[in-house]
Amino acid sequence: MAKLYFNYATMNAGKTTMLLQASYNYRERGMTTMLFVAGHYRKGDSGLISSRIGLETEAEMFRDGDDLFARVAEHHDHTTVHCVFVDEAQFLEEEQVWQLARIADRLNIPVMCYGLRTDFQGKLFSGSRALLAIADDLREVRTICRCGRKATMVVRLGADGKVARQGEQVAIGKDVYVSLCRRHWEEEMGRAAPDDFIGFMKS
């Protein structure tokens, strides 16, 4: 039976690079993959999945209200789909996560989702919450904090280099997010007193 996978991490852990490599592995063997990326903050109908190291490929965009099961099923009727990949899966709606589960359960197509677990305030995204609840396989993609510990949280830096402690859940631009361990995230967010001098400028 096919499975629904959720590969989650903080920013700059290499999630997108892993997605592109996995899709390439299928295509290298003559198999067809279907790629999706969040279109919530993009214009037009053409999506692009790109990694920090320069890899990129075209992808279909998904937005709120889209029926992903119907889109994959229609494509599968004409061309066999061997695997579905979803980048920025944190932006999925709960119902769309269930649609992806149906792709695995009813069409027997593996679905590989990649995304963030929490936002800069330590709160779950809607798509991540649903994936953590129903995905068959959860995989943490690891990166490190400035102190060398495993990074599990992110902070957002404003244009002035100061840590943002409030605001909209999403700000466009990967350069404004920094991955930290829980300890240093609490310090930067003002939840705990800092005991080192390697932090960012406080707001």
Curated annotation (Swiss-Prot):
Chain sites annotated for binding ATP: 9-16, 87-90
SUPFAM superfamilies: Glucocorticoid receptor-like (DNA-binding domain), P-loop containing nucleoside triphosphate hydrolases
Family annotation (Pfam families): TK (PF00265)
Active-site residues annotated for this sequence: 88
InterPro entries: P-loop_NTPase, Thymidine_kinase, Thymidine_kinase_CS
Enzyme class: transferase
Disulfide bonds: none
MF term (GO), any: ATP binding
Residues the entry annotates as binding Zn(2+): 145, 147, 181, 184
PROSITE patterns: TK_CELLULAR_TYPE
UniProt subcellular location: Cytoplasm
Cellular-component GO terms for this entry: cytosol
Keyword set, alphabetical order: ATP-binding, Cytoplasm, DNA synthesis, Kinase, Metal-binding, Nucleotide-binding, Transferase, Zinc
EC code(s) of this entry: 2.7.1.21
Membrane-spanning intervals of the chain: none
GO biological process: DNA biosynthetic process; thymidine metabolic process
Reactions mediated catalytically: thymidine + ATP = dTMP + ADP + H(+)
Subunit structure: Homotetramer.
Protein family (similarity comment): Belongs to the thymidine kinase family.
PANTHER family documented for this protein: THYMIDINE KINASE, THYMIDINE KINASE, CYTOSOLIC
Protein name, entry field: Thymidine kinase
